[in-house]
Design a protein with these regions (language model features):
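Accessory "access/gating" subregions that flank catalytic or transport cores
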Residues: 17-95, 140-147
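Catalytic phosphate/nucleotide-handling subdomain of diverse soluble enzymes
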Residues: 1-14, 69, 73-149
Length: 149
């Protein structure tokens, strides 16, 4: 499953890039060839990019736990969500591998909706919150540094 995992990561990274750049949901869910070599993606991952998660809505039945199915569950929730909380609840209520799918959803939705969209009680109950905030601050500072061409 390693080649599929790598392709899913490539696709997700392109989507996350779009979200961090402030793009709308349609642009996030369909990143263009400037960010991704679409033709090189394995067929199951290309179907995700083409919106298979819209046609194959995740169910509460037992999943195969494959990376493509997890990505589809997260993207389906993101596509339908109106806020951060609603999408998280949709993913966790699927039951199978919901922790992983919710983590994937949370990255994308957090980048799209912003930190203040995450319910305060959830943010305040994070374990090692200080370490997470410090690390996020360092990542942001690093991203803001001008890089030589």
């Amino acid at each position: 499953q390693a080649p599929l995992v790598l392709d899913c990561v490539r696709l997700f990274a392109a989507m996350l890039h779009q979200a961090l750049a402030g793009r709308d949901k349609a642009s996030i869910l369909k990143p263009g060839s400037e960010l991704l070599d679409i033709e090189s993606l394995k067929a199951p991952v290309r179907t995700v990019l083409e919106g298979a998660y819209l046609r194959n809505a995740p169910s509460t039945s037992k999943s195969s736990g494959g990376v493509v199915e997890l990505l589809e569950a997260a993207l389906s929730a993101f596509d339908r969500s109106r806020d951060f909380r609603g999408g998280v609840l949709e993913v966790v209520n699927l039951g199978h591998d919901s922790d992983i799918a919710a983590a994937v959803y949370g990255q994308l939705a957090g980048a799209f909706y912003g930190v203040n969209a995450i319910p305060g009680t959830w943010r305040n109950s994070l374990m090692r919150k200080d370490l997470l905030e410090e690390t996020a601050g360092r990542l942001l500072a690093s991203a803001m540094v001008e890089r030589p061409d």
